[in-house]
């Protein structure tokens, strides 16, 4: 693995390689000698899992009777099938029609260059749906290949599983042969299955801005490309093979451990023939990726609603790809680029059916996932985490119970919550439903060995245990060897009488049926509120819920809706005396860091940077080094509860600016008035405004802005090509906060003032020189202009609001004076000395 690039503004990004473990090579020797060696070699590779007990079932052997003409896939024959079978003492009449929604042969294969003749055939099999005995509440969903039926029947509250009986007697009437029909009974105490479905015929949702902290369905419309080496190797089976690989990759993205409803949808399949000027595919993985990314963009359409549009592209090749130092590379992709048309792409070296995990791994990078051994992932996964996840840096047997690590789930969740997956919200109009059968049914162990090690390779049957690791024959230095790449047998591969592999285990067919039935997930209860992010000044606390009641299984729908909620906390004012704002404290935490700039001799002071920061980046910790004048993103996120800007009451929550009122309550509608009084009516202050035109060379006092002033605005307009006056600010102690000592600040900047107040300055070279801020000022400020020439047609205007004087005791009215005078005269008249002369 190596990182060779970066993508600013999206956390860690770059180009990543996925490597392969070195093959184990063993000479073909008698089994008795080899057993102990294999036990040692495979001990670390075998999955530790307990076999599930089969659920109670009833079953019968049946012979489906076809009542209408043959249905020949791809031949234009009637897409309707009537079938009758006797089971459980009842006659079941199946009225089936071809389901266009799952019609594999509906996919258009696009050939660029000379199309290979062997690839023009249609795929075997038709998907049929219908009813049973005319019951509108019943459901029949079956796959028909001209000689066998495979699928599920739901009739009168019972669930029936129909499949061909291996080694069964053919039907004497020429119809389907012997099948086995199982009636599955729910386990005792098991409640009804939650199965949420979208209404049939419902319109596709339009792309919209993602809700924050919500689980939303994402549809990854994928272009699959195979080069000429793939066509030469796979021949007529290339299309079926690619769909099988992508089906396994899509299944990985459906696993609940990814904690998001992600559907991988193949919308276009392109096969490159000879004579086509396609991407330059060579040994260098990096150069191949760059060439493919540039080439695929020309095939895309810009409109997301266009049926030919795709969100990501993936190239399969038989070319041996090499990284910087070795040729163990199996794939490469950029990180965090899923909605970037120029970089949402990946390349995969075809290595057999396990290439599905390579494809899932590279697409994981496109979703911003890092390798599980990266520094951020080590802390998120914990010390007990294994290396058997999709995003492991080296290909290994992926844990079927948890294919995605906690780190992968966290990174894709944060990525989508921050709006980077906006292009995935539109549902494809005509999606291709990938093969539903397990790949091992179409590719036995020998064929899997051929796909991995070449056409002469065969499965080594003498090497136990079955399913855990695929051992294949080969030659090294003229000697016959058995070799493995540590990948398990493909799911569905026969491993014994009435047994097949699943997740690296050999299971009975009864147990295998449990993996065919999707189960939709359901939300669990909300968890308790977490700690507040701040002790004062307005923090944020969270509560979350998980998709665990029940956990989705076998590709069942993941929960949709809000997974995290948050609220304000500790909104009271912080104690007076703190000279720094909350964001200033976060920047100042880097003041003693000497490892950021090796060329700078010592530590430096960091202050927040607001000017020039894009609105979408307000919640990154962007700080400016006062000594150098440069500014950098020191943290991808500020602490939750940090104000988005000095002029806003909105706060940052998980890297996004969320509206809050001036009372520091998220969602509140309270606002500051012009006097900066929360919820006030503006009556507590008055506007002061004026202009200045008496310019003389040097610094000129314009006005003293008093302490407590709010909504300050100063604007100087004139011909910027002949400007000769500039704004300046002087503090009470005689020092300058802006443009003092005949030194100008040419670019936009934040003027930091005592009392954690800042004003935004446009820069001396701006077309309209301005100075603005909400205040209130903690101390008086003298506005000056620096005259450096003969000002012509220059206008300087200013305005601000000042608090109204506190009203004193009201003056008595004339009536009050008359009444009080009468009282005094009456008191004097009653005095003993009154009236004496």
Curated annotation (Swiss-Prot):
Cleaves aggrecan, a cartilage proteoglycan, at the '392-Glu-|-Ala-393' site and may be involved in its turnover. Also cleaves COMP. May play an important role in the destruction of aggrecan in arthritic diseases. Could be a critical factor in the exacerbation of neurodegeneration in Alzheimer disease. The spacer domain and the TSP type-1 domains are important for a tight interaction with the extracellular matrix. The spacer domain is also required for cleavage of COMP. Its EC number is 3.4.24.82. Keywords: Cleavage on pair of basic residues, Disulfide bond, Extracellular matrix, Glycoprotein, Hydrolase, Metal-binding, Metalloprotease, Protease, Secreted, Signal, Zinc, Zymogen. Residues 686-837 are annotated as: Spacer. Expressed in brain, lung and heart. Expressed at very low level in placenta and skeletal muscles. Isoform 2: Detected in osteoarthritic synovium. A motif (Cysteine switch) lies at residues 192-199. GO terms for cellular component: collagen-containing extracellular matrix; extracellular matrix; extracellular region; extracellular space; nuclear speck. One of its GO terms (molecular function) is zinc ion binding. Binds 1 zinc ion per subunit. This is A disintegrin and metalloproteinase with thrombospondin motifs 4. Residues 52-212 form a propeptide. PANTHER family: A DISINTEGRIN AND METALLOPROTEINASE WITH THROMBOSPONDIN MOTIFS 4, ADAMTS A DISINTEGRIN AND METALLOPROTEASE WITH THROMBOSPONDIN MOTIFS PROTEASE. Disulfide bonds join 293-345, 322-327, 339-423, 377-407, 449-472, 460-482, 467-501, 495-506, 532-569, 536-574, 547-559. It is found in: Secreted, Extracellular space, Extracellular matrix. SMART domains: ACR, TSP1. Residues 218-428 form the Peptidase M12B domain. Residues 437-519 form the Disintegrin domain. The active site is at residue 362. The precursor is cleaved by a furin endopeptidase. It catalyses: Glutamyl endopeptidase. Bonds cleaved include 370-Thr-Glu-Gly-Glu-|-Ala-Arg-Gly-Ser-377 in the interglobular domain of mammalian aggrecan. Interacts with SRPX2. Induction: By IL1/interleukin-1. Zn(2+) binds at residues 194, 361, 365, 371. It comes from Homo sapiens (Human). Glycans are attached at residue 68.
């Amino acid at each position: 693995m190596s990182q060779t690039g970066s993508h600013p503004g999206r956390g860690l990004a770059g180009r990543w390689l996925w490597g392969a473990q070195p093959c184990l090579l063993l000479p073909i020797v008698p089994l008795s000698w080899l057993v102990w060696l294999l036990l040692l070699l495979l001990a670390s590779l075998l999955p530790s899992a307990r076999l599930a007990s089969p659920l109670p079932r009833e079953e019968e052997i049946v012979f489906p009777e076809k009542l209408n003409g043959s249905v020949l896939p791809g031949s234009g024959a009637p897409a309707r099938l009537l079938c009758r079978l006797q089971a459980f003492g009842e006659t079941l009449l199946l009225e089936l029609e071809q389901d266009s929604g799952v019609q594999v042969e509906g996919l258009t294969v696009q050939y660029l260059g000379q199309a290979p003749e062997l690839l023009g055939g249609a795929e075997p099999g038709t998907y049929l749906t219908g009813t049973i005995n005319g019951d509108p509440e019943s459901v029949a969903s079956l796959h028909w290949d001209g000689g066998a039926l495979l699928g599920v029947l739901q009739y009168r509250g019972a669930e029936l599983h129909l499949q061909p009986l291996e080694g069964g007697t053919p039907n004497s009437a020429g119809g389907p042969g012997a099948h086995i029909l199982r009636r599955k009974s729910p386990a005792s105490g098991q409640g009804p299955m939650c199965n949420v479905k979208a209404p049939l015929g419902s319109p596709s949702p339009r792309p919209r801005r993602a809700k924050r902290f919500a689980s939303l369905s994402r549809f990854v419309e994928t272009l699959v490309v195979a080069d000429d080496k793939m066509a030469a190797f796979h021949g007529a089976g290339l299309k079926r093979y690619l769909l099988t690989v992508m089906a396994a990759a899509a299944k990985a993205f459906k696993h609940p451990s990814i904690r998001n409803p992600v559907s991988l949808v193949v919308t276009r399949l392109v096969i490159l023939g000879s004579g086509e000027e396609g991407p330059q595919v060579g040994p260098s993985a990096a150069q191949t990726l760059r060439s493919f990314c540039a080439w695929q963009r020309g095939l895309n359409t810009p409109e997301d609603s266009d049926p030919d549009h795709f969100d990501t592209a993936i190239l399969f090749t038989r070319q041996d790809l090499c990284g910087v130092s070795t040729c163990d590379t199996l794939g490469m992709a950029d990180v965090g680029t899923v909605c970037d048309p120029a970089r949402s792409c990946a390349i995969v070296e075809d290595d057999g059916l396990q290439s599905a995990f390579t494809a899932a791994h590279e697409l994981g990078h496109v979703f911003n996932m890092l390798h599980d051994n990266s520094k951020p992932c080590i802390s998120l996964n914990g010390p007990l985490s294994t290396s058997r996840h999709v995003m492991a840096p080296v290909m290994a047997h992926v844990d079927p119970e948890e294919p995605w690590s906690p780190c992968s789930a966290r990174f894709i969740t944060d990525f989508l919550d921050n709006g980077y997956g906006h292009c995935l919200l539109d549902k494809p109009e005509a999606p291709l439903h990938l093969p539903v059968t397990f790949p091992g049914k179409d590719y036995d162990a020998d064929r899997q060995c051929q796909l991995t090690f070449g056409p002469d390779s065969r499965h080594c049957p003498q090497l136990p245990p079955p399913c855990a690791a695929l051992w294949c024959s080969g030659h090294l230095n003229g000697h016959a060897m058995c070799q493995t790449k540590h990948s398990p047998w493909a799911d569905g591969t026969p491993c014994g009488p009435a047994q097949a592999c699943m997740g690296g285990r050999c299971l009975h067919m009864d147990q295998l049926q449990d993996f065919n039935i999707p189960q939709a997930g359901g939300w669990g209860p909300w968890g308790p509120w977490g700690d507040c992010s701040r002790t004062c000044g307005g923090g944020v606390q969270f509560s979350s819920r998980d998709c665990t009641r029940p956990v989705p299984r076998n590709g069942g729908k993941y929960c949709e809706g809000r997974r995290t909620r948050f609220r304000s906390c500790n909104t009271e004012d912080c104690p007076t005396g703190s000279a720094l704002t909350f964001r200033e404290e976060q920047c100042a935490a880097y003041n003693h860091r000497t490892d950021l700039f090796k060329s700078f001799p010592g530590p430096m002071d960091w202050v927040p940077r607001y000017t020039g920061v894009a609105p979408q980046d307000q919640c990154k910790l962007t700080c400016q080094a006062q000594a150098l004048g440069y500014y950098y993103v020191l943290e991808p996120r500020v602490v939750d509860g940090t104000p988005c800007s000095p002029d806003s009451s909105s706060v940052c929550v998980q890297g996004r600016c969320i509206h809050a009122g001036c009372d520091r309550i998220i969602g509140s509608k309270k606002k500051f008035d012009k006097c900066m009084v929360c919820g006030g009516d503006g009556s507590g202050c008055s506007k002061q405004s004026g202009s200045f035109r008496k310019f003389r060379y040097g610094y000129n006092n314009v006005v003293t802005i008093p302490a407590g002033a709010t909504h300050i605005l100063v604007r100087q307009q004139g011909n910027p090509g002949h400007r000769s006056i500039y704004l300046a600010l002087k503090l009470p102690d005689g020092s300058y906060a802006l443009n003092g000592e005949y030194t100008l600040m040419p670019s936009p900047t934040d003027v930091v003032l005592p009392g954690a107040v800042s004003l935004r300055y446009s820069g001396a070279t701006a077309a309209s020189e301005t100075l603005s801020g909400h205040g209130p000022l903690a101390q008086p400020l003298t506005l000056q202009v620096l005259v450096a020439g003969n000002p012509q047609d220059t206008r300087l205007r200013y305005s601000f609001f000042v608090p109204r004087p506190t009203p004193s005791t009201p003056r008595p009215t004339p009536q009050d004076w008359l009444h009080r005078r009468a009282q005094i005269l009456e008191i004097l008249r009653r005095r003993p000395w009154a009236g004496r002369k």
